[in-house]
Protein backbone atom coordinates (compact mmCIF):
# COMPACT_ATOMS: atom_id res chain seq x y z
CA UNK A 1 0.00 0.00 0.00
CA UNK A 2 2.86 2.29 0.84
CA UNK A 3 4.59 1.81 -2.51
CA UNK A 4 1.31 2.37 -4.37
CA UNK A 5 0.66 5.62 -2.56
CA UNK A 6 4.26 6.69 -3.24
CA UNK A 7 3.84 5.91 -6.93
CA UNK A 8 0.71 8.00 -7.01
CA UNK A 9 2.56 10.91 -5.44
CA UNK A 10 5.43 10.55 -7.93
CA UNK A 11 2.97 10.63 -10.82
CA UNK A 12 1.32 13.74 -9.44
CA UNK A 13 4.71 15.36 -8.99
CA UNK A 14 5.62 14.54 -12.58
CA UNK A 15 2.41 16.09 -13.85
CA UNK A 16 2.86 19.20 -11.74
CA UNK A 17 6.38 19.59 -13.14
CA UNK A 18 5.20 19.73 -16.75
CA UNK A 19 3.78 22.71 -18.58
CA UNK A 20 0.11 23.55 -17.88
CA UNK A 21 -0.92 22.54 -21.40
CA UNK A 22 0.73 19.11 -21.15
CA UNK A 23 -0.68 18.55 -17.67
CA UNK A 24 -4.16 19.44 -18.89
CA UNK A 25 -3.80 17.10 -21.88
CA UNK A 26 -2.66 14.25 -19.62
CA UNK A 27 -5.59 14.74 -17.26
CA UNK A 28 -8.00 14.89 -20.22
CA UNK A 29 -6.57 11.65 -21.66
CA UNK A 30 -6.96 9.87 -18.33
CA UNK A 31 -10.56 11.09 -17.97
CA UNK A 32 -11.33 10.09 -21.56
CA UNK A 33 -9.92 6.61 -20.93
CA UNK A 34 -12.11 6.24 -17.86
CA UNK A 35 -15.16 7.29 -19.87
CA UNK A 36 -14.40 4.78 -22.66
CA UNK A 37 -14.13 2.08 -20.01
CA UNK A 38 -17.46 3.18 -18.55
CA UNK A 39 -19.14 3.03 -21.97
CA UNK A 40 -17.73 -0.46 -22.50
CA UNK A 41 -19.15 -1.65 -19.20
CA UNK A 42 -22.54 -0.23 -20.13
CA UNK A 43 -22.56 -2.06 -23.47
CA UNK A 44 -21.76 -5.34 -21.72
CA UNK A 45 -24.41 -4.61 -19.12
CA UNK A 46 -26.97 -4.07 -21.88
CA UNK A 47 -26.06 -7.42 -23.46
CA UNK A 48 -26.28 -9.32 -20.18
CA UNK A 49 -29.15 -7.35 -18.66
CA UNK A 50 -32.26 -8.13 -20.75
CA UNK A 51 -35.73 -6.93 -19.90
CA UNK A 52 -36.81 -8.43 -16.54
CA UNK A 53 -39.24 -11.33 -16.48
CA UNK A 54 -41.68 -12.38 -13.79
CA UNK A 55 -41.50 -15.74 -12.03
CA UNK A 56 -45.05 -16.96 -12.68
CA UNK A 57 -44.66 -19.98 -10.42
CA UNK A 58 -43.87 -17.75 -7.45
CA UNK A 59 -46.43 -15.04 -8.33
CA UNK A 60 -44.84 -12.57 -5.92
CA UNK A 61 -46.75 -9.27 -5.68
CA UNK A 62 -45.39 -6.42 -7.78
CA UNK A 63 -46.03 -2.83 -6.72
CA UNK A 64 -46.50 0.42 -8.61
CA UNK A 65 -46.96 3.61 -6.56
CA UNK A 66 -48.97 2.05 -3.75
CA UNK A 67 -50.92 -0.54 -5.78
CA UNK A 68 -50.17 -4.27 -5.62
CA UNK A 69 -50.58 -6.66 -8.56
CA UNK A 70 -50.72 -10.44 -8.92
CA UNK A 71 -51.18 -12.46 -12.11
CA UNK A 72 -54.94 -12.61 -11.59
CA UNK A 73 -55.33 -8.88 -10.87
CA UNK A 74 -57.94 -7.70 -13.34
CA UNK A 75 -57.86 -3.93 -13.32
CA UNK A 76 -56.42 -1.27 -11.03
CA UNK A 77 -54.46 -3.24 -8.47
CA UNK A 78 -54.93 -3.66 -4.76
CA UNK A 79 -53.90 -0.79 -2.51
CA UNK A 80 -52.92 -1.41 1.12
CA UNK A 81 -55.79 -2.23 3.48
CA UNK A 82 -55.88 1.21 5.09
CA UNK A 83 -56.46 3.80 2.38
CA UNK A 84 -58.26 7.05 2.00
CA UNK A 85 -60.89 7.79 -0.58
CA UNK A 86 -59.94 8.54 -4.18
CA UNK A 87 -59.77 12.30 -4.76
CA UNK A 88 -62.38 13.93 -6.98
CA UNK A 89 -61.45 14.48 -10.58
CA UNK A 90 -61.11 18.24 -10.05
CA UNK A 91 -58.66 17.90 -7.14
CA UNK A 92 -55.50 19.89 -7.84
CA UNK A 93 -52.22 20.81 -6.36
CA UNK A 94 -51.98 24.55 -5.84
CA UNK A 95 -49.04 26.84 -6.46
CA UNK A 96 -47.45 29.10 -3.87
CA UNK A 97 -45.96 32.31 -5.19
CA UNK A 98 -43.69 33.74 -2.49
CA UNK A 99 -42.97 37.45 -2.20
CA UNK A 100 -39.30 37.11 -3.15
CA UNK A 101 -40.29 35.79 -6.60
CA UNK A 102 -39.19 37.84 -9.56
CA UNK A 103 -40.68 38.30 -13.00
CA UNK A 104 -43.96 39.40 -14.51
CA UNK A 105 -47.34 37.77 -14.84
CA UNK A 106 -47.20 36.03 -18.19
CA UNK A 107 -48.17 33.06 -20.30
CA UNK A 108 -46.75 30.41 -17.92
CA UNK A 109 -49.19 31.61 -15.26
CA UNK A 110 -52.14 31.36 -17.64
CA UNK A 111 -51.02 27.90 -18.77
CA UNK A 112 -50.83 26.80 -15.16
CA UNK A 113 -54.33 28.06 -14.42
CA UNK A 114 -55.76 26.41 -17.53
CA UNK A 115 -54.33 23.10 -16.38
CA UNK A 116 -56.20 23.35 -13.11
CA UNK A 117 -53.26 24.47 -10.98
CA UNK A 118 -54.56 27.73 -9.47
CA UNK A 119 -52.03 30.37 -8.48
CA UNK A 120 -52.35 32.10 -5.11
CA UNK A 121 -51.34 35.74 -5.58
CA UNK A 122 -52.86 37.27 -2.47
CA UNK A 123 -49.44 38.06 -0.99
CA UNK A 124 -47.43 38.02 -4.17
CA UNK A 125 -45.66 41.00 -5.69
CA UNK A 126 -44.94 39.24 -8.98
CA UNK A 127 -45.25 35.87 -10.60
CA UNK A 128 -42.31 33.88 -11.91
CA UNK A 129 -42.60 30.63 -13.87
CA UNK A 130 -40.70 28.86 -11.09
CA UNK A 131 -40.36 31.36 -8.23
CA UNK A 132 -37.53 31.52 -5.74
CA UNK A 133 -38.15 29.72 -2.45
CA UNK A 134 -40.08 31.79 0.08
CA UNK A 135 -38.22 33.66 2.80
CA UNK A 136 -37.73 31.47 5.85
CA UNK A 137 -37.34 28.30 3.76
CA UNK A 138 -34.05 26.51 4.43
CA UNK A 139 -31.69 25.47 1.70
CA UNK A 140 -31.32 21.72 1.36
CA UNK A 141 -27.83 20.39 2.02
CA UNK A 142 -27.81 16.96 0.42
CA UNK A 143 -24.45 15.91 -1.05
CA UNK A 144 -24.63 15.78 -4.84
CA UNK A 145 -22.36 14.40 -7.50
CA UNK A 146 -21.31 15.82 -10.88
CA UNK A 147 -22.40 13.86 -13.95
CA UNK A 148 -20.91 11.55 -16.52
CA UNK A 149 -23.98 10.28 -18.33
CA UNK A 150 -23.01 9.62 -21.93
CA UNK A 151 -22.80 5.91 -21.17
CA UNK A 152 -26.16 5.92 -19.45
CA UNK A 153 -27.74 7.68 -22.43
CA UNK A 154 -26.29 5.11 -24.81
CA UNK A 155 -27.43 2.21 -22.64
CA UNK A 156 -30.94 3.59 -22.29
CA UNK A 157 -31.29 4.32 -25.99
CA UNK A 158 -30.47 0.68 -26.73
CA UNK A 159 -32.97 -0.54 -24.16
CA UNK A 160 -35.89 1.50 -25.49
CA UNK A 161 -35.34 0.86 -29.20
CA UNK A 162 -37.71 -2.12 -29.14
CA UNK A 163 -41.19 -2.30 -27.61
CA UNK A 164 -41.43 -3.94 -24.23
CA UNK A 165 -42.60 -7.53 -23.88
CA UNK A 166 -45.06 -8.70 -21.25
CA UNK A 167 -42.38 -10.87 -19.59
CA UNK A 168 -45.00 -12.75 -17.63
CA UNK A 169 -45.98 -9.63 -15.71
CA UNK A 170 -49.60 -8.95 -14.69
CA UNK A 171 -51.21 -6.98 -17.56
CA UNK A 172 -52.81 -4.62 -15.04
CA UNK A 173 -49.36 -3.79 -13.67
CA UNK A 174 -48.02 -3.06 -17.16
CA UNK A 175 -51.04 -0.83 -17.87
CA UNK A 176 -50.35 1.08 -14.66
CA UNK A 177 -46.62 1.37 -15.38
CA UNK A 178 -47.30 2.59 -18.91
CA UNK A 179 -49.75 5.22 -17.65
CA UNK A 180 -47.08 7.01 -15.59
CA UNK A 181 -45.72 10.13 -17.28
CA UNK A 182 -42.12 9.65 -18.42
CA UNK A 183 -39.90 12.68 -19.05
CA UNK A 184 -36.69 12.05 -20.99
CA UNK A 185 -33.79 13.87 -22.59
CA UNK A 186 -34.96 16.04 -25.49
CA UNK A 187 -33.12 17.48 -28.47
CA UNK A 188 -33.71 20.44 -30.75
CA UNK A 189 -35.44 22.77 -28.29
CA UNK A 190 -34.99 26.54 -28.04
CA UNK A 191 -31.38 27.25 -27.15
CA UNK A 192 -30.55 27.77 -23.48
CA UNK A 193 -27.76 30.40 -23.56
CA UNK A 194 -24.43 29.59 -21.99
CA UNK A 195 -23.47 31.43 -18.85
CA UNK A 196 -20.97 34.26 -19.28
CA UNK A 197 -19.54 33.56 -15.82
CA UNK A 198 -15.90 32.45 -16.18
CA UNK A 199 -16.57 29.71 -13.61
CA UNK A 200 -19.33 28.14 -15.72
CA UNK A 201 -17.04 26.01 -17.89
CA UNK A 202 -15.27 24.56 -14.86
CA UNK A 203 -18.63 23.55 -13.36
CA UNK A 204 -19.36 21.24 -16.30
CA UNK A 205 -18.35 17.60 -16.25
CA UNK A 206 -15.41 16.54 -18.39
CA UNK A 207 -17.80 14.82 -20.79
CA UNK A 208 -19.83 17.99 -21.28
CA UNK A 209 -16.73 20.17 -21.66
CA UNK A 210 -15.38 17.79 -24.28
CA UNK A 211 -18.74 17.52 -26.03
CA UNK A 212 -19.48 21.25 -26.14
CA UNK A 213 -15.99 22.25 -27.24
CA UNK A 214 -16.82 20.86 -30.71
CA UNK A 215 -20.44 22.00 -30.83
CA UNK A 216 -22.47 25.17 -30.83
CA UNK A 217 -20.78 27.66 -28.52
CA UNK A 218 -23.89 29.80 -28.09
CA UNK A 219 -25.81 27.47 -25.82
CA UNK A 220 -27.60 24.16 -25.30
CA UNK A 221 -30.38 22.88 -27.55
CA UNK A 222 -30.39 19.49 -25.83
CA UNK A 223 -30.08 18.36 -22.21
CA UNK A 224 -28.43 15.07 -23.15
CA UNK A 225 -25.57 14.43 -20.74
CA UNK A 226 -26.64 16.79 -17.97
CA UNK A 227 -30.42 16.98 -17.54
CA UNK A 228 -31.41 13.55 -16.23
CA UNK A 229 -32.06 14.66 -12.63
CA UNK A 230 -34.23 17.50 -13.93
CA UNK A 231 -36.17 15.02 -16.08
CA UNK A 232 -36.57 12.67 -13.11
CA UNK A 233 -37.89 15.59 -11.07
CA UNK A 234 -40.26 16.57 -13.88
CA UNK A 235 -41.56 13.00 -13.99
CA UNK A 236 -42.20 12.99 -10.25
CA UNK A 237 -43.98 16.34 -10.39
CA UNK A 238 -46.05 15.49 -13.47
CA UNK A 239 -47.30 12.25 -11.92
CA UNK A 240 -48.17 14.06 -8.68
CA UNK A 241 -50.31 16.45 -10.74
CA UNK A 242 -51.88 13.60 -12.68
CA UNK A 243 -52.81 11.61 -9.57
CA UNK A 244 -54.08 14.72 -7.79
CA UNK A 245 -56.34 15.68 -10.68
CA UNK A 246 -57.41 12.36 -12.18
CA UNK A 247 -57.04 9.94 -9.25
CA UNK A 248 -54.80 6.92 -8.85
CA UNK A 249 -56.98 4.72 -11.10
CA UNK A 250 -56.37 6.89 -14.19
CA UNK A 251 -55.09 4.98 -17.21
CA UNK A 252 -54.17 6.10 -20.70
CA UNK A 253 -57.47 4.81 -22.04
CA UNK A 254 -59.43 7.24 -19.85
CA UNK A 255 -59.76 11.02 -20.26
CA UNK A 256 -56.67 11.93 -22.31
CA UNK A 257 -57.56 15.63 -22.04
CA UNK A 258 -56.20 15.75 -18.48
CA UNK A 259 -52.92 14.27 -19.66
CA UNK A 260 -52.65 16.81 -22.49
CA UNK A 261 -53.11 19.70 -20.05
CA UNK A 262 -50.38 18.39 -17.76
CA UNK A 263 -47.93 17.53 -20.55
CA UNK A 264 -48.33 21.10 -21.84
CA UNK A 265 -46.86 22.40 -18.57
CA UNK A 266 -43.65 20.45 -19.20
CA UNK A 267 -43.10 21.28 -22.87
CA UNK A 268 -39.54 22.16 -23.88
CA UNK A 269 -40.35 25.83 -24.28
CA UNK A 270 -39.90 28.83 -21.94
CA UNK A 271 -43.67 29.44 -22.07
CA UNK A 272 -44.27 26.15 -20.25
CA UNK A 273 -43.91 26.79 -16.50
CA UNK A 274 -42.04 23.53 -15.77
CA UNK A 275 -39.94 23.39 -18.93
CA UNK A 276 -36.26 22.49 -18.95
CA UNK A 277 -35.56 26.18 -19.67
CA UNK A 278 -37.37 27.37 -16.55
CA UNK A 279 -35.76 24.71 -14.38
CA UNK A 280 -32.36 25.94 -15.58
CA UNK A 281 -33.26 29.61 -15.11
CA UNK A 282 -34.43 28.98 -11.57
CA UNK A 283 -31.41 26.81 -10.88
CA UNK A 284 -29.15 29.70 -11.86
CA UNK A 285 -31.06 32.24 -9.75
CA UNK A 286 -31.67 30.20 -6.60
CA UNK A 287 -29.13 27.38 -6.58
CA UNK A 288 -26.07 28.75 -8.36
CA UNK A 289 -26.34 26.14 -11.11
CA UNK A 290 -25.04 27.00 -14.58
CA UNK A 291 -26.70 25.94 -17.87
CA UNK A 292 -25.31 22.54 -18.79
CA UNK A 293 -24.35 21.76 -15.19
CA UNK A 294 -25.84 18.73 -13.49
CA UNK A 295 -28.71 19.27 -11.04
CA UNK A 296 -28.75 17.19 -7.87
CA UNK A 297 -31.79 16.17 -5.79
CA UNK A 298 -31.67 19.36 -3.69
CA UNK A 299 -31.56 21.79 -6.59
CA UNK A 300 -34.31 19.89 -8.38
CA UNK A 301 -36.48 19.98 -5.26
CA UNK A 302 -36.09 23.74 -4.95
CA UNK A 303 -37.13 24.20 -8.56
CA UNK A 304 -40.35 22.27 -7.88
CA UNK A 305 -41.18 24.54 -4.94
CA UNK A 306 -43.57 26.68 -7.01
CA UNK A 307 -46.30 24.16 -6.23
CA UNK A 308 -47.69 23.73 -2.75
CA UNK A 309 -44.79 21.56 -1.67
CA UNK A 310 -43.32 20.76 1.72
CA UNK A 311 -39.54 20.33 1.58
CA UNK A 312 -37.51 18.69 4.30
CA UNK A 313 -34.17 20.20 5.23
CA UNK A 314 -30.80 18.49 5.67
CA UNK A 315 -32.36 15.87 7.98
CA UNK A 316 -35.12 13.46 6.84
CA UNK A 317 -37.34 15.14 9.42
CA UNK A 318 -40.92 16.26 8.71
CA UNK A 319 -42.32 18.82 11.16
CA UNK A 320 -46.08 18.75 11.49
CA UNK A 321 -46.45 22.47 12.23
CA UNK A 322 -44.45 23.39 9.11
CA UNK A 323 -46.38 20.93 6.98
CA UNK A 324 -49.76 22.20 8.14
CA UNK A 325 -48.76 25.80 7.47
CA UNK A 326 -48.34 24.72 3.85
CA UNK A 327 -51.21 22.25 3.47
CA UNK A 328 -53.83 23.93 5.67
CA UNK A 329 -52.73 27.51 6.35
CA UNK A 330 -56.13 28.82 7.49
CA UNK A 331 -57.03 25.68 9.44
CA UNK A 332 -60.20 25.16 7.40
CA UNK A 333 -59.19 23.95 3.94
CA UNK A 334 -56.65 21.18 3.40
CA UNK A 335 -54.91 21.40 0.02
CA UNK A 336 -53.39 18.34 -1.67
CA UNK A 337 -49.70 18.73 -0.87
CA UNK A 338 -46.56 17.13 -2.21
CA UNK A 339 -43.92 16.17 0.37
CA UNK A 340 -40.37 15.98 -0.98
CA UNK A 341 -37.80 14.30 1.24
CA UNK A 342 -34.29 14.99 -0.02
CA UNK A 343 -31.99 12.56 1.76
CA UNK A 344 -28.87 10.45 1.65
CA UNK A 345 -28.97 6.94 3.07
CA UNK A 346 -25.30 6.07 3.08
CA UNK A 347 -21.90 7.06 1.72
CA UNK A 348 -21.26 5.11 -1.49
CA UNK A 349 -24.22 2.74 -1.21
CA UNK A 350 -27.47 2.61 0.72
CA UNK A 351 -26.96 1.29 4.23
CA UNK A 352 -28.70 -2.13 4.34
CA UNK A 353 -30.64 -1.13 7.46
CA UNK A 354 -32.67 1.21 5.22
CA UNK A 355 -33.48 -1.27 2.42
CA UNK A 356 -36.89 -2.40 3.65
CA UNK A 357 -38.02 1.09 4.63
CA UNK A 358 -36.98 2.48 1.24
CA UNK A 359 -38.85 -0.22 -0.68
CA UNK A 360 -41.93 0.40 1.49
CA UNK A 361 -42.06 4.04 0.34
CA UNK A 362 -43.20 2.76 -3.07
CA UNK A 363 -45.90 0.60 -1.45
CA UNK A 364 -47.64 3.41 0.44
CA UNK A 365 -50.87 4.77 -1.08
CA UNK A 366 -49.33 8.26 -0.93
CA UNK A 367 -46.29 7.21 -3.00
CA UNK A 368 -45.25 9.43 -5.91
CA UNK A 369 -41.88 7.81 -6.49
CA UNK A 370 -38.17 8.35 -6.04
CA UNK A 371 -35.98 10.62 -8.18
CA UNK A 372 -32.41 9.56 -7.80
CA UNK A 373 -30.62 6.63 -8.87
CA UNK A 374 -27.80 4.40 -9.67
CA UNK A 375 -24.11 4.96 -10.35
CA UNK A 376 -23.63 7.24 -13.37
CA UNK A 377 -27.31 8.10 -13.80
CA UNK A 378 -30.54 9.35 -12.29
CA UNK A 379 -33.85 7.55 -12.70
CA UNK A 380 -37.46 7.83 -11.58
CA UNK A 381 -38.38 4.78 -9.48
CA UNK A 382 -42.08 3.91 -9.32
CA UNK A 383 -42.37 0.18 -8.55
CA UNK A 384 -40.92 -2.73 -6.63
CA UNK A 385 -40.95 -6.50 -6.36
CA UNK A 386 -38.95 -8.03 -3.55
CA UNK A 387 -35.55 -6.32 -3.51
CA UNK A 388 -35.86 -5.02 -7.08
CA UNK A 389 -37.06 -1.52 -7.95
CA UNK A 390 -38.63 -0.61 -11.30
CA UNK A 391 -37.81 2.72 -12.88
CA UNK A 392 -38.39 5.03 -15.82
CA UNK A 393 -35.07 6.00 -17.36
CA UNK A 394 -34.72 9.58 -18.68
CA UNK A 395 -31.53 8.77 -20.63
CA UNK A 396 -33.36 8.32 -23.92
CA UNK A 397 -33.04 11.35 -26.24
CA UNK A 398 -36.17 12.26 -28.19
CA UNK A 399 -37.22 15.30 -30.25
CA UNK A 400 -38.26 18.32 -28.21
CA UNK A 401 -41.81 18.32 -26.88
CA UNK A 402 -43.45 21.41 -28.43
CA UNK A 403 -45.57 23.93 -26.56
CA UNK A 404 -49.21 24.00 -27.68
CA UNK A 405 -51.42 27.00 -26.94
CA UNK A 406 -54.32 24.57 -27.04
CA UNK A 407 -53.35 21.35 -25.23
CA UNK A 408 -55.89 19.45 -27.33
CA UNK A 409 -53.57 19.97 -30.31
CA UNK A 410 -51.04 17.46 -28.96
CA UNK A 411 -50.81 14.46 -31.26
CA UNK A 412 -50.97 10.84 -30.19
CA UNK A 413 -47.31 10.48 -31.17
CA UNK A 414 -46.31 13.36 -28.91
CA UNK A 415 -48.22 11.88 -25.98
CA UNK A 416 -46.79 8.43 -26.70
CA UNK A 417 -43.29 9.90 -26.30
CA UNK A 418 -44.12 10.46 -22.60
CA UNK A 419 -44.90 6.80 -21.89
CA UNK A 420 -43.28 3.39 -22.15
CA UNK A 421 -44.31 -0.18 -21.42
CA UNK A 422 -40.74 -1.41 -21.31
CA UNK A 423 -39.59 -2.38 -17.82
CA UNK A 424 -36.18 -1.63 -16.33
CA UNK A 425 -35.25 -2.63 -12.80
CA UNK A 426 -32.39 -2.28 -10.34
CA UNK A 427 -31.53 -4.13 -7.14
CA UNK A 428 -31.79 -1.95 -4.04
CA UNK A 429 -28.15 -2.72 -3.21
CA UNK A 430 -27.07 -1.00 -6.44
CA UNK A 431 -28.96 2.25 -5.86
CA UNK A 432 -27.10 5.46 -5.16
CA UNK A 433 -27.76 6.78 -1.62
CA UNK A 434 -28.69 10.35 -2.67
CA UNK A 435 -32.33 10.68 -3.66
CA UNK A 436 -35.54 12.69 -3.63
CA UNK A 437 -38.62 10.82 -2.32
CA UNK A 438 -42.12 12.12 -3.07
CA UNK A 439 -45.47 11.62 -1.32
CA UNK A 440 -48.84 13.17 -2.20
CA UNK A 441 -51.01 13.94 0.84
CA UNK A 442 -54.61 14.51 -0.30
CA UNK A 443 -56.39 15.28 2.99
CA UNK A 444 -56.00 15.09 6.77
CA UNK A 445 -56.96 11.40 6.92
CA UNK A 446 -54.27 10.74 4.34
CA UNK A 447 -51.80 12.71 6.46
CA UNK A 448 -52.59 10.67 9.58
CA UNK A 449 -52.23 7.40 7.67
CA UNK A 450 -48.93 8.48 6.13
CA UNK A 451 -47.47 9.50 9.50
CA UNK A 452 -48.28 6.09 10.94
CA UNK A 453 -47.01 4.24 7.87
CA UNK A 454 -43.55 5.84 7.73
CA UNK A 455 -43.09 5.20 11.45
CA UNK A 456 -44.03 1.52 11.49
CA UNK A 457 -41.70 0.00 8.89
CA UNK A 458 -39.37 -2.97 8.84
CA UNK A 459 -35.75 -2.05 9.40
CA UNK A 460 -34.78 1.50 10.25
CA UNK A 461 -37.17 4.31 9.36
CA UNK A 462 -35.88 6.77 6.77
CA UNK A 463 -38.41 9.51 7.60
CA UNK A 464 -39.27 10.88 11.02
CA UNK A 465 -42.28 13.05 11.86
CA UNK A 466 -42.08 15.48 14.79
CA UNK A 467 -44.85 17.77 16.10
CA UNK A 468 -42.86 21.01 16.08
CA UNK A 469 -39.93 22.58 14.33
CA UNK A 470 -37.37 23.31 17.08
CA UNK A 471 -36.29 26.44 15.23
CA UNK A 472 -39.73 27.89 15.94
CA UNK A 473 -39.06 27.61 19.66
CA UNK A 474 -41.93 25.17 20.15
CA UNK A 475 -39.97 22.00 20.80
CA UNK A 476 -36.62 20.36 20.76
CA UNK A 477 -36.93 17.92 17.87
CA UNK A 478 -36.73 14.18 18.10
CA UNK A 479 -34.34 12.87 20.71
CA UNK A 480 -31.32 11.22 19.13
CA UNK A 481 -31.84 12.68 15.66
CA UNK A 482 -28.48 14.43 15.67
CA UNK A 483 -26.73 11.13 16.44
CA UNK A 484 -27.99 9.69 13.15
CA UNK A 485 -26.48 12.40 10.97
CA UNK A 486 -23.51 11.44 8.84
CA UNK A 487 -21.28 14.50 8.55
CA UNK A 488 -19.83 14.88 5.07
CA UNK A 489 -17.32 17.45 3.88
CA UNK A 490 -17.23 19.05 0.44
CA UNK A 491 -14.47 16.60 -0.49
CA UNK A 492 -16.83 13.71 0.26
CA UNK A 493 -19.31 15.08 -2.26
CA UNK A 494 -16.91 14.45 -5.12
CA UNK A 495 -16.89 10.74 -4.30
CA UNK A 496 -20.66 10.28 -4.39
CA UNK A 497 -21.90 8.20 -7.29
CA UNK A 498 -24.99 10.06 -8.43
CA UNK A 499 -23.54 10.91 -11.85
CA UNK A 500 -25.82 11.98 -14.66
Curated annotation (Swiss-Prot):
The keyword Protein transport applies. Its EC number is 3.4.22.-. GO terms for biological process: aggrephagy; autophagosome assembly; mitophagy; piecemeal microautophagy of the nucleus; protein processing; protein transport. GO terms for molecular function: cysteine-type endopeptidase activity; protein-phosphatidylethanolamide deconjugating activity. Keywords: Autophagy, Cytoplasm, Hydrolase, Nucleus, Protease, Protein transport, Thiol protease, Transport. It catalyses: [protein]-C-terminal L-amino acid-glycyl-phosphatidylethanolamide + H2O = [protein]-C-terminal L-amino acid-glycine + a 1,2-diacyl-sn-glycero-3-phosphoethanolamine. It is an enzyme of class 3 (hydrolase). It is found in: Cytoplasm; Nucleus; Preautophagosomal structure. InterPro entries: Papain-like_cys_pep_sf, Peptidase_C54, Peptidase_C54_cat. The active site is at residues 228, 393, 395. It comes from the Eukaryota. One of its GO terms (cellular component) is phagophore assembly site. Cysteine protease that plays a key role in cytoplasm to vacuole transport (Cvt) and autophagy by mediating both proteolytic activation and delipidation of ATG8. Required for selective autophagic degradation of the nucleus (nucleophagy) as well as for mitophagy which contributes to regulate mitochondrial quantity and quality by eliminating the mitochondria to a basal level to fulfill cellular energy requirements and preventing excess ROS production. The protease activity is required for proteolytic activation of ATG8: cleaves the C-terminal amino acid of ATG8 to reveal a C-terminal glycine. Belongs to the peptidase C54 family. This is Probable cysteine protease ATG4. It comes from Podospora anserina. The gene is ATG4.
Amino acid sequence: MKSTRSGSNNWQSAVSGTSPKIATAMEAAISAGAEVSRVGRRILQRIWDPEPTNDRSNNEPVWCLGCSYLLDTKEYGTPPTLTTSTPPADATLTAIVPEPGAGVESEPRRATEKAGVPVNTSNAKAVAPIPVAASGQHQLQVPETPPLSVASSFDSALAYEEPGQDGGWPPAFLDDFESRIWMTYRTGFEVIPRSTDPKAAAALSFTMRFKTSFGDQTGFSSDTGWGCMIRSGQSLLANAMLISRAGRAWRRTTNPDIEREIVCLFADDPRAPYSIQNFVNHGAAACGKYPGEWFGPSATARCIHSLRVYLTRDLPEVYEDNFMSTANPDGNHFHPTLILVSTRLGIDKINPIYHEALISTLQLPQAIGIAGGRPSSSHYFIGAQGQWLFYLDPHHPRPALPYRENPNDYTIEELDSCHTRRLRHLHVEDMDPSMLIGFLIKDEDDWDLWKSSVKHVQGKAIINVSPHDPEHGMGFGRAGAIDEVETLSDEDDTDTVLDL
